[in-house]
């Protein structure tokens, strides 16, 4: 009896020690995963990081889950190895083999897969998207600027890796008109019932049969979902020419000013309706430059110019506004000249950072950044160098 009791005590002690050891290992693993996330995936707007450490049913330490960034997964494994814990690796990276193109003039992307979800951004027709998850009604996608959100499956058309490669090599045109245009069923149609769709600045289409054909001044085009139609050829530019542009502040400001009076829309990223950072994105994209999505992200790019030095700003520089005590950026504008800028606040309009100007706004001006000369630095990408748009060797 005494021997049995002693054995039970020893077994309980061993189990307790094992449980304690597992708990310690789990704590180390949780800390390691958190450290990796802090280092490589702090911005959930751009990186999916659904990796967690846990004990399985047998009490074994497991680290599993998905991330959209291979560097984040490598960081997790490195942190775990540095912590000296033994674990089963069930982590994985979303593959780069599922793609989509936006099929409507402006698709709304939301923070969750529901129409009641907050609108995070938009993509215009022909925008290439990396597909992370497919549901029956919502797809989780990543836009070329890295932004991750959910888009209705009805707003996109899916492509395989080979189909996406073929699209990148196809004869494509981009809408460079600042104003909305109509696509008609025939080259001579003008009636309201003859409209296939509208297109906005930045929409990308292909040519029917792979060869540009113009009839009655209209280009015969194919939309991402296979629909065809005709639109005024003068509104299109071959995508290679658009992407080859040099920095042109006049082009950027022309697009921005063409939207004057356009209503503000949170998450709006098209000429239909637009928010402050969307105005910067759309205007720069017209010049072939892809900016980050949000003002707080854009504020960390380019060359910084202090607010007190606003007189040294040049046309096309971005101005950032927000909380003077915390430095938190909440608004962005595009600088023109002599303190004047264009921005979206309620509507697209003009104001000034010059305290002596009648159009001066009291919202604290924090700093500016210069995009010119900083292309291909973090957060600023020329479309011609983006592998989703072109085959980049």
Please report, for each region that a protein language model flagged, where it lies by residue.
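Boundary regions of SH3-family modules and the immediately adjacent low-complexity/disordered segments
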Residues: 68, 74-97, 114, 143-181, ...
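Aromatic- and glycine-rich peptidoglycan recognition patches
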Residues: 158-167, 181, 189, 237, ...
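Short, basic/aromatic beta-hairpin or loop at an interaction surface
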Residues: 97-109, 170-185, 285-300
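Beta-loop motif signature
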Residues: 101-130, 176-207
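N-terminal targeting leaders
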Residues: 4, 8-9, 13, 19-127, ...
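Catalytic cysteine-centered active-site loop
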Residues: 264-278, 282-313
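SH3/SH3-like beta-barrel superfamily modules
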Residues: 60-62, 66, 73, 120-152, ...
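Glycine-rich catalytic cores of cysteine/serine-nucleophile enzymes that process amide/ester linkages
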Residues: 186-188, 194-199, 212-218, 261-274, ...
């Amino acid at each position: 009896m005494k021997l049995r009791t002693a054995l039970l005590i020893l077994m309980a002690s061993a189990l307790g020690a094992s449980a304690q050891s597992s708990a310690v290992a789990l704590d180390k693993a949780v800390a390691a995963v958190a450290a990796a996330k802090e280092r490589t995936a702090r911005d959930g707007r751009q990186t999916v990081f659904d990796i967690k450490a846990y004990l399985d049913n047998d009490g074994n330490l497991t680290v599993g889950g998905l991330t959209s960034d291979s560097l984040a997964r490598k960081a997790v494994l490195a942190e775990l190895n540095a912590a000296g814990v033994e674990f089963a690796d069930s982590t994985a990276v979303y593959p780069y083999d599922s793609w989509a193109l936006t099929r409507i003039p402006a698709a709304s992307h939301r923070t969750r897969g529901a129409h009641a979800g907050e609108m995070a951004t938009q993509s215009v027709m022909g925008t290439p998207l990396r597909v992370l998850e497919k549901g029956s009604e919502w797809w989780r996608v990543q836009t070329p600027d890295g932004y991750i959100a959910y888009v209705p499956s009805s707003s996109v058309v899916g492509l395989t890796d080979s189909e996406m490669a073929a699209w990148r090599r196809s004869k494509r045109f981009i809408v460079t008109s600042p104003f909305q245009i109509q696509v008609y069923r025939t080259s001579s149609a003008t009636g309201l019932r003859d409209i296939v769709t509208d297109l906005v600045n930045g929409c990308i289409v292909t040519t029917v049969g792979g060869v540009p054909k113009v009839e009655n001044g209209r280009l015969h085009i194919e939309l991402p979902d296979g629909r065809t139609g005709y639109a005024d050829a003068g509104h299109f530019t071959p995508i290679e020419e658009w992407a080859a542009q040099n920095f042109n502040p006049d082009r950027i400001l022309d697009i921005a000013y063409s939207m004057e009076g356009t209503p503000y829309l949170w998450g709006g990223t098209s000429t239909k309706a637009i928010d402050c950072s969307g105005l910067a994105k759309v205007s720069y994209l017209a010049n072939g430059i892809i900016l980050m999505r949000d003002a707080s992200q854009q504020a960390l790019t380019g060359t910084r110019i202090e607010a007190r030095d606003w007189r040294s700003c040049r046309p096309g520089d971005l101005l950032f506004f927000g909380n003077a005590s915390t430095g938190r950026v909440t608004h962005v504008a595009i600088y023109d000249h002599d303190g004047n800028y264009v921005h979206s606040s309620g509507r697209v309009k003009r104001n000034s950072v010059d305290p002596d100007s009648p159009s001066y706004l009291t919202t604290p001006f924090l700093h500016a950044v210069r995009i010119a000369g900083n292309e291909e630095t973090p957060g600023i990408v020329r479309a011609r160098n983006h592998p989703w748009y072109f085959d980049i060797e």
